[in-house]
């Protein structure tokens, strides 16, 4: 459905899991995130040593074509059924030239304070994304997810993984 909407506009492209070239630069998108405390679990994955967060809703849900599938034991489901971030990253298209590659990833890498929460001393970035960017060394990576990070005492809006600039 989202692809059909994007197709209606000349300059709109869904880059989730895809590569799109603009003026010699390749943009590669990835919209998955680690588990969060909210009920809607679309695009949620896990990592090997990830500890699930306390949930704000007793029931989780994953969207289907008309509604959403209710999951009553989310913690058990998240341990056994969720894909791993590293596997999602392995499936991304490869850039032709890493020095002109820009990864657009919803979730930030761990350890860079791009995912710093305001009210907890917690950086909730992804270890797998950090390792992926460290190995691939693209020109740039762009992230969202924790929009308050630059406004926190310890948070940052820009950092580096070797030659890769992460924003």
Task: List where the protein language model places each region.
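Active-site metal-binding loops of divalent metal-dependent hydrolases
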Residues: 1, 18-19, 30-33, 107, ...
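Glycine/small-residue-rich loop that forms an oxyanion/phosphate-binding "nest" at active or ligand-binding sites
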Residues: 2-18
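N-terminal cationic-hydrophobic initiation segments that often serve targeting/anchoring roles
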Residues: 6, 93-94, 133-134
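Short, well-ordered coil/turn elements that cap or connect secondary structure elements
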Residues: 7-10, 22, 98, 161
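Conserved acidic residues
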Residues: 12, 99-102, 139
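Conserved beta-sheet core of the metallophosphoesterase superfamily
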Residues: 16, 21, 111-167
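Active-site-proximal loop/helix segment associated with metal-binding centers of metalloenzymes
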Residues: 25-119
């Amino acid at each position: 459905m989202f692809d059909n909407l994007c197709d209606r506009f000349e300059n709109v492209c869904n880059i989730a899991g895809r590569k799109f070239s603009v003026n010699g630069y390749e943009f590669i998108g990835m919209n998955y995130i680690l588990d969060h405390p909210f009920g809607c679990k679309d695009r949620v994955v896990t990592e090997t040593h990830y500890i699930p967060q306390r949930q704000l809703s007793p029931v989780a849900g994953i969207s289907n074509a008309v509604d959403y599938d209710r999951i009553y034991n989310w913690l058990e489901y998240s341990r056994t059924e969720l894909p791993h971030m590293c596997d999602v990253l392995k499936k991304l298209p490869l850039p032709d030239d890493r020095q002109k590659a820009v990864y657009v990833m919803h979730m930030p890498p761990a350890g860079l304070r791009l995912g710093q929460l305001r009210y907890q001393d917690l950086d909730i970035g992804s270890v797998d994304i950090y390792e992926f960017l460290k190995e691939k060394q693209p020109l740039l990576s762009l992230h969202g997810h924790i929009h308050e990070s630059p406004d926190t005492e310890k948070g940052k809006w820009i950092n580096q993984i070797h030659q890769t600039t992460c924003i």
